[in-house]
Amino acid sequence: DKMSREKIFNLKAMGAEVVLTRSDVAKGHPEYYQDLAARIASETPGAFFVNQFGNPDNPAAHEFGTGPEILRQMDGQLDAIVFGCGSSGTMTGLSRAFAEQAPNVELILADPIGSILTEYINEGTLSEKSGSWMVEGIGEDFLPQISDFTRVKIAYAISDKESFLTARELLAKEGI
């Protein structure tokens, strides 16, 4: 229920059946988005559950694609990168790419208030209780199987309000 209307419309335009899930239920609940996706895939002939949270191809795509591309576009002049984290594929892949090609790049997590990742990065403790947030696609209530946070130096908890205001400012000033 946090997916933008535009993404839903685009998926439907390409012929996809979109099943909206609840964001107020935890892992293990029958309506939890990952559990529901796995169940739909297992009950649908010919279906495949991509499982972005456990699929090693997710971080590999960023380790060998996104990371080198960022370094090329920046002519290797990169001091730090600030990112959000959902499945952790981008973060894990970038971390691996930069460890090899630009080990001095600092990785910084911008995490929604309510996600367990800020506390995990900053304090090393893993909370079993998460809050709720409205920002789409980032923040977690568990550590994804593919995650590797060892190179992330610091995390900042960002409110939904600040996130949405910053997104609007970037759109107005930078066109992104």
Features from the language model and the residues they span:
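Active-site-proximal loop->helix
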Residues: D1-I40, I113, L117-L126, S130, ...
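Short, flexible, glycine/charge-rich loop motifs used to bind or transfer phosphoryl groups or to couple energy/partner
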Residues: K7, I70-Q73, A97-F98, L143-I146
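Conserved hydrophobic/aromatic pocket- or pore-lining residues that grip, position, or stack substrates
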Residues: L11, I70, L107
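Surface-exposed amphipathic alpha-helices with a cationic face
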Residues: K12, S95-A102
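Generic beta-sheet signal
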Residues: T21, Q52, I108-A110
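Active-site/ligand-binding loops adjacent to catalytic centers
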Residues: Q34, G46, A99-I176
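Active-site/ligand-binding-proximal alpha/beta "capping" segment
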Residues: T44-C85, L94, F149, K153, ...
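Hydrophobic/small residue at the entry helix of a nucleotide-binding pocket
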Residues: T90
